[in-house]
């Protein structure tokens, strides 16, 4: 009986691996036929592309595999981007095909993402129970004083500063945070380390770790996640 169970387990494992291998290869084919022209063979993007907003480096993305799938399916604009550079592909490929692409990107370009993010979270300051009760109020204060200059008071990515940047031909495209896919932890890490650390080609979203401590940045992330973000 033990041999039968062991044999079944081995066959199941082999079948599961075969499915993963097929998903990887199919995702690779689609990526090379469709995505490579913007994101490059290694997912690091061609920095010489003549675009106002250049594609992100997939090798540094903060996104999970599921989040990458959602971005690819619906397009970046659906999830808060004010640039339509990353279009929707749901009318071109099936969900299964887009899941294969996301799987390929995760395994080929960013296999250590989870370890990297967990390490950064483990190294961040923990928040005491006493301070946790102050987070939303603190986050709102800092957001209104600092983040709203680009993202707007409501977090919609529209502000006077953004309009001035257009007039000066120095375009910036703050996200509509009401629709962001990022979790509270991801928002914290994105604010702490800045956009370039996570693969953007411009530094419109700077690192705030030298100005604010982890308590303040985690408070802002909590405020955005609970009070601004409308897509859960």
Task: Locate the predicted segments by residue.
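Extracytoplasmic electron-transfer domains, predominantly the class I c-type cytochrome c fold
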Residues: 52-108, 164-227
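The canonical Cys-X-X-Cys-His
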Residues: 27-41, 101, 139, 143-154, ...
């Amino acid at each position: 009986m033990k041999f039968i169970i062991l044999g079944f387990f081995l066959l199941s494992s082999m079948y599961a691996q075969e499915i993963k291998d097929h998903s990887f290869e199919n995702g690779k084919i689609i990526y090379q036929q469709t995505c490579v022209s913007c994101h490059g063979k290694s997912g690091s993007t061609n920095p010489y592309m003549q675009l106002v907003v250049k594609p992100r480096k997939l090798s540094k993305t903060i996104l999970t595999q599921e989040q990458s799938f959602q971005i690819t399916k619906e397009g970046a604009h659906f999830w808060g981007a004010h640039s339509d550079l990353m279009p929707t592909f749901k009318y071109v490929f099936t969900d299964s095909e887009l899941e294969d692409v996301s799987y390929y990107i995760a395994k080929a370009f960013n296999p250590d993402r989870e370890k990297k993010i967990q390490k950064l979270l483990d190294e961040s300051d923990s928040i005491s129970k006493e301070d946790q009760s102050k987070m939303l109020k603190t986050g709102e204060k800092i957001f209104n004083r600092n983040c709203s200059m680009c993202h707007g008071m409501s977090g919609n990515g529209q502000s006077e500063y953004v309009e001035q940047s257009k007039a000066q031909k120095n375009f910036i495209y703050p996200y509509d945070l009401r629709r962001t896919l990022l979790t509270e932890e991801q928002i914290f890490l994105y604010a702490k380390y800045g956009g370039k650390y996570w693969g953007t080609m411009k530094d419109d979203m700077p690192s705030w770790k030298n100005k604010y401590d982890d308590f303040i940045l985690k408070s802002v992330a909590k405020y955005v996640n609970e009070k601004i973000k409308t897509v859960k």
